[in-house]
């Protein structure tokens, strides 16, 4: 049976002064997409409450107030903001991919959240390496988030912005046979060169992985740019750089991309195109050479606290009997190693 789903890449501006308002705007966009028959909607990078554009155009010594405001408006996951989006996704029967500034106690993270069509969060991942100015704002993610998940729309993977220039991060998702890659960029940055580079990146990933790419970028109005910085020279750094698009496994646009203003790119994804591409070049299957080249990925969630403990000494009645192979190995739960008497 032929599989076809309708996807939307949504180019949208945050409400800089109202994080809750941005959440409501996202929910309205989900309803609007649902009216168009959309089954998968992808929103831009850290849309909620907004991408930290201030860190790109202001020196660190002057951005303390803006940094504090971002902390105040960043969202816990789960929390009221994600619950509102989950409800909208559930009502629309839609898979939603959303970028948020996640607050985890005293740290902020660039997080991507995938909501399944029933509203459940099936993936929350954090950008593994914040880029350039972003390192003053966000902490780092871990390898556990480089995961493809099953959803009502298919097998989904996600990366944010320049993570796409980390070929091993992309390959980690490719080896899990992602069918739809959900890409997010901030948009409204750097100018046309950023949009051009972005298009090359997403089209290349579609070709290399043999999957669809749904890419969403943000947008800033002139008034918002002026609010971020009154300096004309710096305002140029916050214009252009948008390429909201949907790409086929053959590397072609399935609908005209959106470069300016708010809007929605909608296209039908015919999954037979994945087979059409992969029958000739499956980079993690018949076209791979794992005995020559392969990937090692650490899937353990990052932790800053590891508990070491020692098991209680066994009684003689419960000691394991000796074997021809010698004494039994130490209990694997024991995390304290004591040197033998006389050892150095």
Feature-to-residue mapping (PLM):
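Active-site glycine-rich loop that binds ribose-phosphate moieties when present
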Residues: 131-147, 164-168
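Cys-nucleophile CN-hydrolase/nitrilase-fold catalytic domain and related Cys-dependent amidase chemistry
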Residues: 19, 28-117, 187-209
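CN hydrolase (nitrilase-like) catalytic-core segments centered on the catalytic cysteine
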Residues: 76-97, 155, 161-265
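Short beta-strand scaffold segments in enzyme catalytic cores
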Residues: 98-100, 111-114, 147, 244-246, ...
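C-terminal beta-strand edge segments of enzyme domains
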Residues: 217-344
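Short hydrophobic alpha-helix segments
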Residues: 118, 124-125, 257
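Active-site-proximal beta-strand elements of phosphoester/diester hydrolases
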Residues: 4-15, 42, 111, 124, ...
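N-terminal phosphate-binding loop and adjacent alpha-helix
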Residues: 11-29
């Amino acid at each position: 049976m032929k599989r076809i789903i309708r996807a939307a890449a949504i180019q949208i501006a945050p409400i800089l002064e109202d994080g809750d308002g941005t959440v409501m705007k996202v929910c309205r966009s989900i309803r609007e997409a649902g009216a168009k028959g959309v089954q998968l909607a992808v929103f831009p990078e850290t849309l909620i409450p907004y991408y930290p554009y201030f860190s790109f155009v202001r020196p660190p010594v002057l951005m303390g107030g803006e940094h504090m405001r971002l902390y105040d408006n960043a969202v816990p996951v789960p929390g009221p903001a994600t619950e509102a989006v989950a409800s909208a996704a559930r009502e629309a029967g839609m898979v939603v991919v959303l970028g948020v500034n996640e607050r985890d106690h005293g740290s902020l993270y660039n997080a991507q959240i995938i909501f399944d069509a029933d509203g459940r969060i099936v993936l929350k991942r954090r950008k593994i390496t914040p880029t350039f100015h972003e390192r003053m704002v966000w902490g780092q993610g871990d390898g556990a988030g480089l995961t493809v998940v099953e959803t009502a729309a298919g097998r989904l993977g996600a990366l944010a912005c320049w993570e796409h220039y980390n070929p091993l991060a992309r390959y980690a998702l490719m080896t899990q046979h992602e069918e739809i890659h959900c890409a997010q960029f901030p948009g409204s940055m750097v100018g046309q060169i950023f949009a051009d580079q972005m298009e090359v990146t997403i089209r290349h990933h579609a070709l290399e992985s043999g999957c669809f790419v749904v890419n969403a970028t943000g947008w800033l109005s002139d008034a918002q740019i002026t609010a971020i910085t009154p300096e004309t020279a710096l305002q140029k750094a916050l214009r252009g750089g948008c390429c909201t698009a949907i790409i086929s496994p053959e590397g072609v646009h399935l609908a005209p991309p959106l470069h300016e203003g708010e809007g929605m790119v909608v296209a039908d994804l015919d999954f037979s195109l994945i087979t059409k591409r992969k029958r000739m070049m499956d980079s993690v299957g018949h076209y791979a050479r794992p005995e020559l080249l392969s990937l090692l990925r650490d899937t353990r969630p990052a932790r800053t606290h590891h508990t070491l403990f020692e098991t209680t000494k066994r009684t003689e009645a419960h000691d394991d009997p000796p074997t021809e192979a010698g004494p039994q190995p130490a209990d694997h739960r024991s995390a304290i190693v004591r040197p033998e008497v006389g050892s150095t």
